[in-house]
């Protein structure tokens, strides 16, 4: 049987790697949209309520920690001996979606909620919204 050329083998391995990765989005590093079910109520008693699939941002972003440079040590009075850099999975774009609420009887209401439109790895913040 004749051997395949090196170009054919490289192409085959590339196609194999791409098709294997299609079903593994959760394993891919980064920050991605992730759907979840949310129940919306008009008040605490649940007079009107409805459900909707909203989008969240879920994933892993890069972080690292390393010994601080000498200039950082001196500037901090030798208290800042470790420097860490990190990013968090963050919502970078929102959109409003309308949720239909079913009320007591046959009455209906409509309510707007926010859902994630886009995600990205960004600076970690205690509270952004």
Curated annotation (Swiss-Prot):
What does the organism's lineage look like at the top? Eukaryota, Metazoa, Chordata, Craniata, Vertebrata
Asked whether the keyword Disulfide bond is assigned, the reply is: yes
- Tell me, what does this protein do in biology? Functions as a heterodimeric glycoprotein hormone with GPHB5 able to bind and activate the thyroid-stimulating hormone receptor (TSHR), leading to increased cAMP production. Plays a central role in controlling thyroid cell metabolism.
Stated family: Belongs to the glycoprotein hormones subunit alpha family.
Q: What is this protein called?
A: Glycoprotein hormone alpha-2
* Signal peptide range: 1-23
Under the subunit heading, UniProt states: Heterodimer with GPHB5; this heterodimer interacts with thyroid-stimulating hormone receptor (TSHR), and hence stimulates cAMP production.
Q: Which domain of life is it from?
A: Eukaryota
Q: Which is one GO molecular function term here? A: thyrotropin-releasing hormone receptor binding
Q: Name one GO biological process term.
A: cell surface receptor signaling pathway
Q: Which UniProt keywords apply?
A: Disulfide bond, Glycoprotein, Hormone, Secreted, Signal
Q: How is it modified after translation?
A: Glycosylated.
Q: At which residues is glycosylation annotated?
A: 37, 81
């Amino acid at each position: 049987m004749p051997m395949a050329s090196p170009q054919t083998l490289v192409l085959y391995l590339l196609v194999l790697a791409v098709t294997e990765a299609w079903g593994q989005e959760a394993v891919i590093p980064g920050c991605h949209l992730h759907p979840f079910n949310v129940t919306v109520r008009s008040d605490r008693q649940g007079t009107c309520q409805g459900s909707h699939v909203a989008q969240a941002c879920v994933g892993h972003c890069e972080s690292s920690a390393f010994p601080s440079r000498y200039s950082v040590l001196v500037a901090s009075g030798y208290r800042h001996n470790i420097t860490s850099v990190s990013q968090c999975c963050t919502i970078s774009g929102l959109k409003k979606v309308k949720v239909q609420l079913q009320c007591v009887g046959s009455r209906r209401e409509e309510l707007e909620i926010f859902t994630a439109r886009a995600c990205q790895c960004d600076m970690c913040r205690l509270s952004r919204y």
